[in-house]
């Protein structure tokens, strides 16, 4: 159930989907939706694109305090299950839209995460042109991990390749480091953490006839994930066929106060 809360501009609307407030952008550069819970980009469809760049679960219930399955969750201030809740608290908390600027060829949205004492703990900036850039800035006193957990929308898992990856990774499913091809095809469940070598990763999608470029800024790791048939919560049994996660992460060299991590995402001519 969707209900309008506030019309901020002619191109920017605050709505509520079930229990979650969501910003909807309809602008000449493209369309996007951002959940205020987690400052989580849910969808982005740039001008002229036939398909959304990001995958969002068809059965996502939008329940407050429960992680949203899809888009670009912000895993922060820790990654994985080293503490609870898994992947940190930022994706479960409400952020505030603190600034926005809509120009003819560019949109900038900024979100702030406040502590219970009103102190800013983190900021997230999203910039939309023909590219989408997401920047998370750490403003906490303690060093932190972060990952931009991007779920990419794909035509069919059997028709993609992830290119320009390192040739070794830590395989979380096997619990060990292993050698892998630099170009990965996904034919079973995968959960690999790579030490960043090249700042660009490419997702080639034959079914959608497109190539997505992910440029990793101020990151030290890339995470490649697809659950295959071990379906997590809020995902259809065959949902794994239409998504793959390529995450921009800072896991080893912790973020210090004022440091940022960002992912720049663009579509390229389908050289496939």
Model-derived regions: residue spans:
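Beta-strand-rich recognition/accessory modules
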Residues: 1-28, 35, 112-116, 193-272
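Hydrophobic residues positioned within well-ordered beta-strands of beta-sheet architectures
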Residues: 23, 32, 109, 122-124, ...
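Short acidic/polar mixed-charge low-complexity motifs
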Residues: 28-32, 40, 49-52, 118-120, ...
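Acidic-aromatic substrate-binding/catalytic surfaces of carbohydrate-active enzymes
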Residues: 28-85
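Beta-strand/loop-rich accessory regions of lumenal/periplasmic or secreted enzymes
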Residues: 62-90, 98, 163-177, 198-201, ...
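Extended, loop-rich substrate-binding clefts of extracytoplasmic carbohydrate-active enzymes
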Residues: 84-129
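Acidic, contiguous internal or C-terminal segments within carbohydrate-active enzymes
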Residues: 111-154
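Active-site/ligand-binding surface loops and adjacent short beta/alpha elements
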Residues: 143, 151-222, 227
């Amino acid at each position: 159930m969707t209900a309008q809360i506030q019309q901020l501009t002619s191109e920017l609307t605050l709505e509520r989907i079930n229990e979650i407030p969501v910003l909807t952008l309809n602008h000449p550069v493209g369309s996007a939706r951002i959940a205020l819970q987690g400052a989580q980009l849910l969808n982005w469809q740039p001008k002229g694109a036939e398909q959304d760049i990001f995958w969002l679960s068809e059965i996502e219930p939008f329940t407050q305090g429960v992680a949203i399955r899809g888009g670009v969750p912000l895993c922060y201030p820790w990654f994985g299950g080293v503490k609870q809740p898994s992947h940190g608290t930022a994706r479960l908390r409400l952020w505030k839209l603190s600034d926005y600027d809509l120009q003819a060829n560019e949109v900038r949205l900024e979100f702030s995460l406040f502590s219970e004492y009103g102190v800013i703990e983190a900021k997230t900036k999203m910039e939309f042109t023909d590219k989408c850039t997401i920047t998370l800035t750490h403003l906490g006193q303690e060093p932190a991990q972060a990952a931009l957990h991007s779920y990419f929308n794909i035509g069919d898992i059997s028709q993609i390749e992830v290119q320009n990856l390192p040739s070794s990774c830590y395989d979380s499913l096997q619990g060990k480091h292993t050698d892998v091809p630099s170009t990965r095809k996904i034919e079973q469940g995968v959960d690999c953490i790579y030490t960043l070598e090249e700042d660009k990763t490419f997702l080639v999608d034959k079914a959608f006839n497109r190539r997505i470029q992910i440029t990793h800024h101020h990151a030290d790791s890339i995470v490649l994930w697809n659950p295959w048939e071990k379906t997590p919560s809020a995902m259809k049994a065959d949902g794994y066929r239409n998504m793959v996660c390529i995450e921009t992460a800072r896991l080893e060299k912790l973020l210090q106060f004022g440091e940022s991590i960002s992912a720049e995402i663009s579509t390229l001519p389908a050289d496939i």
